[in-house]
């Protein structure tokens, strides 16, 4: 499973050849559509249709997870406590990638700290 954080959504939504090539490569590897927890949208959208247009186009190709079950929220809280860093959104991103998933990000520091306490989650920088 491939999970995107807000930085990855923003980067992949850029109108660049590199971003388009990466999405195509992920699709070819069977890793697309990516999973995006809905709480990530709070960090990568601005609430303006024009400014959010490219991100919204990308999100239409992803599996956006609307509901965060209580068990997943508790797991994210445990990851935050153990790592002693990271936002609630970052912790949910890592928890949803368990077990054995990959998180794509532009800022791996807090995510790597959380993943150190996860079940085999890998953090990849784009």
Predicted regions: what they are:
Residues 1-35, 45-63, 124-126:
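Short, well-structured N-terminal submotif of metal-dependent ribonuclease cores
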């Amino acid at each position: 499973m491939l999970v995107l954080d807000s930085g990855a959504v923003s980067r992949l939504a850029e109108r660049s050849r590199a971003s388009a090539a990466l999405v195509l490569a992920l699709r070819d590897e069977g890793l697309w559509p990516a999973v995006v927890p809905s709480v990530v949208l709070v960090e990568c959208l601005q609430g303006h249709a024009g400014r959010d247009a490219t991100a919204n186009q990308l999100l239409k190709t992803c599996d956006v997870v609307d509901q965060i079950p209580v068990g997943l929220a508790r797991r994210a809280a445990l990851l935050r406590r153990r790592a002693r860093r990271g936002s609630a959104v970052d912790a949910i991103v890592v928890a949803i990638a368990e077990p054995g998933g990959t998180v794509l990000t532009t800022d791996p520091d807090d995510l790597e700290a959380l993943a150190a306490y996860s079940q085999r989650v890998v953090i990849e920088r784009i």
